[in-house]
């Protein structure tokens, strides 16, 4: 039977519960245990798929097509365990399920209440699909005291009894702030947070204390005394120069040993942290430096591109170079005459990421043109590939009116909804439930690369599988025109209907992909496209 680790947070939000959960899972993995991490999100949205990137950050997509919290990206990057639909639940989905059951009469006329119906649904989710695991780590979103999280707190309190003593523990992450006027760290917020937690019937077994400077032994002992935990179970969590140094830091402070001790497990052998020390060696001792210009729409909140940021870092790790990322608002290129060159000339490579909507699209197209004409390495992801196709259609294929139906009616739909295509016979509609699936293409799909293509060389294979999240596709009926203009369709869906990869053979490095390769990149296994892209940027840096 799997043991459960429930992770809660207190004092303030954004302390790093997700990173702590991912790091702890990585440490347990390094000791030979099989782990899985889950996220409980108390918000009432069914999933984050329709939430604003400015509020929620990126939507992380799993192989099975789940639209999930960005923390699942951390979990997968740190452990290498692919996330699943069963690893993320929201209050919205819980209530949706319960209401559907009530409407069907599944409750046989009973009064449906938070206890037991909501809490039972949460417990059922937590315990599902855990066969063969040693540890299941469950992160509770939000902060202790939030109204939204109360049903989840009650559910995990009940789970401790359901699982039996010794089969679950509680880890609580808090803030120990430094008050400059007093010249000391203050433990009172942590004490109050634990008091709030115990008032809900939950006594933490391990306390992880975020602080910006070392936690003195006296303060550590004070926290242990007032919060009713052993001193060795009070774990300082200092700021780190890189998130990939966090597992090493937590191990040094004894987090994994404290967790095993709370379960009554003796930590016999040291964990194998070789790959984490190697990653940090490459990050701290780079042999070069590149600057990547990311021309996007949501640059006001970098969490909107979290996986992309990390994948670029992974590309740097693969090449042992430091990657500097310049986030550039695509709308700037629509407002400032001649501003493109000033912004992009210092860049060693240009990337246009995914996104939705018309705002900033002409700026992205201008960035594609700059990269194509100046022979600067270009990487287009999802919308970035579509913009590359529209730019190519307009400027190298002679289709001046080329556009996408996403932005409105157009006479030249080079990009269109998955359910509609332009052929020689006119606009063709495909049913949402047909062979091509629904209007949102989600999750992992296979693709086939041309054997002599740049993409196949990068992958070292011709059959690949990548994750998608999009409603629009490049219209395959424009393939011949675009290829005459030098933009080659080097990757297609297995049935040959959906373009997956485009490239320019006459360019040093120009690749567009309809999928999201950043979702599968890991620090110890960088995605080949990002490794190759950063290598091309490094080559470009030596030319300027």
Swiss-Prot record:
Active site positions: 382, 516, 518
Positions with a binding annotation for UTP: 13, 186-191, 222
PROSITE patterns registered for this protein in UniProt: GATASE_TYPE_1
InterPro entries noted in UniProt: Class_I_gatase-like (IPR029062), CTP_synthase (IPR004468), CTP_synthase_N (IPR017456), GATASE (IPR017926), GATase1_CTP_Synthase (IPR033828), P-loop_NTPase (IPR027417)
GO BP, one annotated term: pyrimidine nucleobase biosynthetic process
Residues involved in L-glutamine binding: 54, 355, 383-386, 406, 471
Binding residue positions for CTP: 13, 146-148, 186-191, 222
Binding site for ATP: 14-19, 71
Enzyme class: ligase
Start and end residues of each stretch annotated as Amidoligase domain: 1-265
Single GO cellular component term: cytosol
Binding site for Mg(2+): 71, 139
Keywords associated with the record: ATP-binding, Glutamine amidotransferase, Ligase, Magnesium, Metal-binding, Nucleotide-binding, Pyrimidine biosynthesis
Top-rank lineage group of the source organism: Bacteria
Keyword Nucleotide-binding: yes
GO molecular-function terms, A-Z: ATP binding; CTP synthase activity; glutaminase activity; identical protein binding; metal ion binding
Quaternary context: Homotetramer.
Protein function: Catalyzes the ATP-dependent amination of UTP to CTP with either L-glutamine or ammonia as the source of nitrogen. Regulates intracellular CTP levels through interactions with the four ribonucleotide triphosphates.
Family matches, as NCBIfam families: PRK05380.1 (NF003792), PyrG (TIGR00337)
Family: Belongs to the CTP synthase family.
Protein name in UniProt: CTP synthase
Gene (name only): pyrG
